[in-house]
Curated annotation (Swiss-Prot):
Residues 6-329 form the Kinesin motor domain. Kinesin is a microtubule-associated force-producing protein that may play a role in organelle transport. Its motor activity is directed toward the microtubule's plus end. The keyword Heme does not apply. Residues 342-864 form a coiled coil. This is Kinesin heavy chain.
């Protein structure tokens, strides 16, 4: 079941690209046949022979038909297969493997054509064979295995077990049932692959990609099963930094790529030189994964992609030499098959027969040995017949066949990480015992897991370190900005503080000024109250003085009435005199007119005229009296002024005595002053009495004179009566003069009477005051009591002043304390409001944190679901369609009644039918469906 075969090597040359043409590159490759090419470069010249050589004008279909179609048939027959694409960067490896577009019939590459060929072969196979197809997609980037279908798994470990061989632990495998599903997997994985632009390739692959297709087939009639695994490897190209211009991360990627390719070359050299006892598969994860493809259980095809230009002649020669070395590798491929029950029964019968033969042979040998040990000689004819060499060899071969571990099938284990691989045939290995090898593999797997874990931790630590450095740089920049802003704000704050201090100082000054104004206002208010009280007192005293003045005026009026009554010259008499004089003048005029006309005058009229003349005589007497009083009015006024001055002096002395505290030594002085004043007043009054007597004598003389004058006037009137015409006007004039004189005399008389009355009243008041002073000066006990009360009053006044000052000071302190209390309350309120705002902000932040944590958890779940499921836009989802549920495919070539291959449309139709019927979402296999 195993066969030794060499690696198939195919060379492909691409046309010159734009970079090579611009650099002056020329073709240096010539093709001598379908399998030979000749290179003529400056460094070396020579011919290279491979299984097939394709020139620059070859098509994708030609390469597939010659190189790959047979590999697909081998996979379906139960062999393992591998297809390599090797070459320098930009040589066309990805184009060869994937093509320009997987939906383009002409431009698509090897992998899409392999997929179509696999499903076409399944459809053309007998209907008794059931197939399951699984795919996985990974890349080796920076010596880390990354699952392209679950990109979050970026550091998967490589394990090796006795029954499973080498596999990648944790690699996602997806069951597919149609070409479109495989294409969707390829698209998703290709989008996640690491690429970058270099000077030689705008889309240079920065990793080795490995697309694995595992096909398991089972004959439903006989129960036999076979499995095949196909590795489709797109290697990253070797690079020269001088040509690619790689730098930074691209340069690090180039280093890792060249290192892994060097490890691949070392493995090929060790396999082909025939001298190496150790094959360095573990030097690189690429060679570790492809261990069975290089000298193991696999049929391998190597496609070397080369440039025909002289610009890359060194790289082309290196690639061709690599292909020549790889062509010398010998693989031992065998079918990965599981025996059917009938075959197992046949093997069991053979084993049972062999066991019977061995048991009889062992028993005969044991009997012979016992006889020999007993010292007996066994006859030669009784010796045990030895088994023939062919029989022994056949028995050993059968034993190896029977003890060969079978390839695990998906029927028994549908959740295996990678397909099982049977024992490798002839792969160089360490000379270890069976138990030691198992322990070594177990220990190696543990170490690989630890290495992967440590690498993941190191990668995460490096990532955190980069993020921390970026954050540190950002924080430094932010810190510098914040420092500058802080300095600016500090300057502004200092300015604001100065302004605040200035405003505070001004506020304090204004407050002090306001307090001073308040104090002044309070003092003025107090003074105003005192003035109001004084005004009230003055009003009261004014009322009292007004009452006294009214009383004085009343007394004055009474005395004036009495004095004027003695003269009997009231206003009514005076008016009557005027009336009589006027009537007399009129009567004289009328008599004169009668006498002029010659009429007779009656005697009665003369009598009446006589009476009126007598009255006129009295009026003339009064006029003379008034004239006399006018002559003495000046002396009266001078005397009145002297009396008023003396009265004012006495009142001033009296007020001084009242305002001054009288002591015992002042009483005699007061008495002397009062005696002097009283003596002076008596002298003045006696003088005034003498003057009044003289005035009375003068008045009597004047009265006599006036009487004489009246008599004279009466005589003149009589004479005038006899001659009225001559003296008529003279009388009228005299009457008018008398009238004026009368008025002036009456005014002077009234004024004199008023002065006399006022002097009498002042004299009475002075007497009363004098008597009061005498009474008060005689009471020494009252004076002592008054002095004691005054001293107490002064002490009480001082105490009251101190209390008022203390009260004002306490009021100020209370006001200050109230201000401080108000400010403290305002501060407490502001702090409480700030605390409430802070609590609200903290609650909002906690709420936002909870929401953010929930969103983060949902995002992680969504990422996990998207990476694990890889939902396709066409309605196919790896998760929803059951990517890890086996999808058996029945061959379609057995008859017309064979079921068709499940496709996306069929899956969608089944899902819709299940949804509408309300049945379980678990899809049933058509293997159990009866037509």
């Amino acid at each position: 079941m195993s066969s030794a075969n060499s690696i198939k090597v195919v060379a492909r040359f691409r046309p010159q690209n734009k970079v090579e043409l611009e650099s002056g590159g020329k073709p240096i490759v010539s093709f001598d046949g379908e399998d030979t090419c000749t290179v003529a470069s400056k460094e070396a010249q020579g011919s290279f022979t491979f299984d097939r050589v394709f020139d620059m004008g070859c098509k994708q279909q030609d390469i597939f038909d010659f190189s790959i179609r047979s590999t697909v048939d081998d996979i379906l027959n139960g062999y393992n297969g591998t297809v390599f694409a090797y070459g320098q960067t930009g040589a066309g490896k990805s184009y060869t493997m994937m093509g320009t577009n997987i939906d383009d019939d002409e431009g698509r590459g090897i992998i899409p054509r392999i997929v179509e060929q696999i499903f076409a072969s399944i459809m053309s196979s007998p209907g008794t064979i059931e197939y399951t197809v699984r795919v996985s997609y990974m890349e080796i980037y920076m010596e880390r295995i990354r699952d392209l279908l679950a990109p979050q798994n970026d550091n998967l470990p490589v394990h090796e077990e006795k029954n499973r061989g080498v596999y990648v632990k944790g690699l996602l495998e997806i069951y597919v049932s149609s070409v479109q599903e495989v294409y969707e997997v390829m698209r998703r994985g290709g989008n996640a692959r690491a690429v970058a632009a270099t000077n030689m390739n705008q889309e240079s692959s920065r990793s080795h990609s490995i697309f694995v297709i595992t096909i398991t087939q089972k004959n439903v009639e006989t129960g036999s099963a076979k499995s095949g695994q196909l590795f489709l490897v797109d290697l990253a190209g070797s690079e020269k930094v001088g040509k690619t211009g790689a730098s930074g991360q691209t340069l690090e990627e180039a280093k890792k790529i060249n290192k892994s390719l060097s490890a691949l070359g070392m493995v090929i050299n060790a396999l082909t030189d025939g001298k190496s006892s150790h094959i360095p598969y573990r030097d690189s994860k690429l060679t570790r994964i492809l261990q069975e493809s290089l000298g193991g259980n696999s049929r391998t095809t190597l496609i070397i992609n080369c440039s025909p230009s002289s610009y890359n002649d060194a790289e082309t020669l290196g690639t061709l030499r690599f292909g020549m070395r790889a062509k010398s590798i010998k693989n031992k491929a065998k079918v990965n098959a599981e025996l059917s029950p009938a075959e197992l029964k046949s093997l069991l019968k053979k084993a049972q027969g062999q066991v019977t033969n061995f048991e009889s042979y062992i028993s005969s040998l044991e009997g012979e040995i016992q006889m020999w040990r007993a010292g007996e000689a066994v006859p030669k004819e009784r010796w045990a017949t030895p088994l023939t060499t062919d029989a022994v060899a056949r028995t050993k071969a059968d034993a190896r066949t029977s003890t060969r571990p079978s390839t695990p099938s998906l029927i028994s284990d549908s959740r295996s990480e990678t397909p099982a691989i049977s024992d490798r045939a002839g792969t160089p290995s360490l000379p270890l015992d069976k138990d030691e090898r198992e322990e070594f593999l177990r220990r190696e797997n543990e170490l690989q897991d630890q290495i992967s874990e440590k690498e993941s931790q190191a990668a995460s630590a490096e990532k955190q370190l980069r993020e921390t450095k970026e954050e540190l740089a950002y924080l430094k920049d932010h810190d510098s900005k914040v420092g500058k802003e802080n300095e600016k704000l500090t300057t502004e704050v200092n300015e604001f503080k100065m302004q605040l201090e200035r405003l505070t100082f001004e506020s304090k000054e204004a407050q002090i000024t306001m307090d001073a104004l308040k104090e002044a206002n309070s003092e003025l208010t107090t003074e105003l109250d005192e003035v109001k009280q004084q005004l009230l007192d003055v009003k009261m005293s004014a009322k009292e003085s007004g009452a006294a003045l009214d009383e004085k005026e009343k007394r004055k009026a009474e005395k004036m009435a009495k004095m004027m009554a003695g003269f009997d010259l009231g206003g009514e008499v005076f008016s009557e005199n005027e009336r009589h004089i006027a009537e007399t003048i009129e009567k004289v005029d009328s008599l004169h007119e009668l006498s002029a006309t010659g009429d007779n005058i009656a005697p009665d009229e003369f009598k009446a005229l006589k009476a009126r003349l007598v009255e006129t005589q009295g009026i003339v007497r009064q006029a003379e009296l008034s004239m006399y009083s006018t002559s003495s009015s000046e002396s009266d006024s001078r005397r009145r002024q002297e009396l008023e001055a003396r009265l004012e002096a006495v009142q001033a002395e009296y007020e001084e005595i009242l305002t001054r505290n009288l002591g015992p030594e002042d009483i005699e002085e007061v008495k002397a002053r009062l005696e002097n004043a009283f003596a002076n007043r008596q002298t003045a009054q006696s003088q005034f009495v003498e003057e009044l007597k003289e005035d009375i004598a003068q008045k009597a003389a004047e009265n006599t004179r006036m009487k004489t004058l009246i008599e004279d006037l009466q005589q003149r009137v009589k004479a005038g009566a006899t001659a009225p015409m001559a003296n008529g006007k003279t009388i009228q004039q005299q009457i008018a003069e008398f009238d004026v004189m009368k008025k002036s005399l009456m005014r002077d008389l009234q004024n004199r009477c008023e002065r006399v009355v006022e002097l009498e009243i002042s004299l009475d008041e002075t007497r009363e005051q004098y008597n009061n002073v005498l009474r008060s000066s005689n009471n020494r006990a009252q004076q002592k009591k008054m002095a004691f009360l005054e001293r107490n009053l002064e002490q009480l006044t001082q105490v009251q002043r101190q209390l008022v000052e203390q009260n004002s000071a306490l009021k100020k302190e209370v006001a200050i304390a109230e201000r401080k209390l108000i400010a403290r309350n305002e501060r407490i309120q502001s702090l409480e409001s700030l605390l409430q705002d802070s609590q609200e902000k903290m609650a909002a932040a906690n709420h936002k944190y909870v929401q953010l944590a929930a969103v983060k958890e949902r995002l992680e779940l969504a990422k996990a679901g998207s990476t694990r499921g890889l939902n396709s836009p066409g309605g196919f989802s790896f998760a929803n369609a059951g990517s890890r549920i086996a999808k058996p495919l029945r061959g379609g070539g057995g008859g017309n009644d064979a079921p068709s291959i499940p496709t996306i449309q069929n899956l969608q139709g089944q899902n819709e039918g299940n949804t509408s019927s309300g049945s379980s979402s678990k899809r049933a296999s058509w293997f159990f469906t009866k037509s």
